[in-house]
């Protein structure tokens, strides 16, 4: 395991547990991620927790059980998110499915000199950007969950 910092997006938790790496099959993966949370290497913003709270499923239950996973939107995170939105206002949207959590997930990684982990895929344009598009433009490292697992050197 590395001592790199990772900021998890909603999609990494939700899609990770629901679709990609179900805990009924990949139980040890989630134990490893829980260890990374306990070690302070994985965090998410409380805006992600609010988004997950609207659900009634395994992802919500697991996230709620991770006491150290979510961090409040402290001033440096808010300031960084404001800078992100000044450059990329279309990262969030009142209509459609773009999440208000996205700039804060990126801001957390920026403030902690870390990497974003998301299951969003880049659109390849900044007109209607997703997390990987904005990360690429701002020079913030961004991985999907499989790439995160590989970066840890974990094998199963």
Language model features: what each stretch is:
Residues 97-116, 130-136:
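Acidic, metal-associated active-site segment
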Residues 1-44, 51-64:
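Short, well-structured N-terminal submotif of metal-dependent ribonuclease cores
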Residues 1-3, 14-16, 89-96, 136:
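Noncatalytic, typically N-terminal accessory segments of nucleic acid-processing enzymes
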Residues 2, 26, 122-156:
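Acidic, PIN/NYN-like endoribonuclease modules and their adjacent C-terminal/linker elements
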């Amino acid at each position: 395991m590395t001592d790199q910092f990772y900021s998890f997006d909603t999609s990494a938790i939700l899609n990770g547990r629901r679709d990609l790496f179900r805990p009924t099959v990949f139980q040890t993966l989630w134990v490893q991620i829980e260890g990374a949370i306990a070690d302070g290497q994985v965090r998410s913003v409380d805006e992600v927790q609010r988004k997950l709270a609207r659900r009634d499923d395994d992802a919500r239950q697991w996230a709620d059980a991770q006491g150290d996973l979510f961090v409040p939107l402290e001033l440096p995170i808010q300031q960084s998110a404001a800078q992100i939105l000044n450059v990329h206002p279309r990262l969030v949207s009142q209509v459609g499915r773009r999440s208000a959590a996205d700039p804060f997930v990126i801001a957390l990684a920026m403030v902690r000199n870390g990497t974003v982990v998301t299951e969003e895929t880049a659109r390849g344009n900044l007109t209607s950007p997703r997390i990987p598009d904005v990360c690429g433009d701002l020079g913030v490292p961004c991985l999907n969950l499989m790439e995160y697992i590989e970066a840890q050197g974990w094998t199963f």
